[in-house]
Design a protein with these regions (language model features):
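Generic beta-strand/beta-sheet core signal
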Residues: 24, 67, 95, 139-141, ...
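Flexible glycine/acidic-rich beta-alpha junction loops that bind and position SAM and/or redox cofactors
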Residues: 30-35, 91-113, 135-149, 178-186
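C-terminal accessory region of radical SAM enzymes
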Residues: 114-147, 177-224
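Short, flexible cytosolic linker that couples an ABC transmembrane/permease module to its adjacent nucleotide-binding
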Residues: 150-155
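Radical SAM enzyme core and accessory elements
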Residues: 170-172, 209-266
Length: 266
């Protein structure tokens, strides 16, 4: 949720019915308000942060994530992660933007190098916070080296289009929310079920071994071939290679492994 319509009824419903809640916040006020605006064009930071604090406080330990997107405007995204932590939030995620080449928000090759450095800064700071007894969780560094996903899950990934689908308010079915509105990937509706079997079959074959460039990659069983939607929007094919995404994913896994090694040696 972007938070604008959160009230006590929403908070109560989320506490009773939702095992996890994802709250959209891009970090520092000036960063968040660049793109997250209300219908009048005003930034939403001041309106939503108090609501997010109230919702998180009410959950009493249930899962939540404060989740943001960083763009060309803030490749120094760790400042935004630390800002969220300073607000009192401890379960955090920041995702790189996926945008068409030439889009003002798109990450450049120069940005990618900055972002890689930022991932290292974040990992080191998380270790420091952990030693000080005030840990934070960063979604992309959650790595279980002993009891991780089964091999089927490692190969198939998120299961979009096969194990789950997105349902629009009008009852239409799509492989996931990022394909909503693209009629090529309309799968059917809740009344008739899945009628476009070709799309479902296409997604069944979208896995860690479907991409030629993944076959010799050391990280393929961590990413399961990556996000089909990101690949599609970047290359035009759900089995394409979104190279920026690959580079950043591998850097995140490197940092997550480094943290595990550091924790084991302490």
């Amino acid at each position: 949720t972007n938070g604008m319509l959160i009230d006590e009824d929403v908070i109560d419903f989320a506490d009773r019915q939702m095992s996890n809640v994802v709250l959209s916040l891009d970090g520092r006020k000036e960063i968040h308000d660049r793109l997250r605006v209300d219908y009048k064009g005003n930034g939403s930071y001041d309106a939503i942060v108090p609501k997010f604090k109230r919702l998180v406080e009410s959950r009493g330990g249930k899962d939540y994530y404060i989740r943001g997107t960083f763009t060309h405007a803030n490749p120094d995204f760790t400042k935004d992660v630390f800002h969220m932590a300073d607000l009192g939030f401890t379960q955090l995620s920041m995702e790189p933007v996926v945008a068409a080449e030439g889009d003002p928000a798109a990450l450049t090759s120069e940005d990618i190098e900055i972002v890689k450095q930022q991932y290292e800064i974040l990992a080191q700071d998380m270790l420091r916070r952990q030693r000080e007894g005030r840990p934070i969780t960063f979604y992309h560094y959650m790595l279980d080296l002993e009891h991780g996903p089964c091999i089927y899950k490692r190969i198939s990934g998120c299961g979009s289009g096969t194990e789950y689908m997105a349902v629009t308010p009008w009852g239409e079915l799509y492989p996931c929310h990022q394909f909503v509105g693209d009629e090529k990937y309309s799968m059917g509706d809740i009344w008739k079920g899945v009628t476009n079997k070709e799309v479902q079959d296409e997604f069944k074959c979208c896995n860690a071994y479907a991409r030629e460039g993944c076959k010799d990659c050391w990280a393929k069983l961590y990413c399961s071939g990556g996000c089909a939607a990101n690949a599609y929007h970047a290359t035009g094919s759900i089995t394409g290679i979104y190279e920026y995404g690959c580079d950043l994913f591998k850097k995140r896994i490197e940092c997550a492994i480094m943290m595990k090694v550091s924790e084991a040696s302490e």
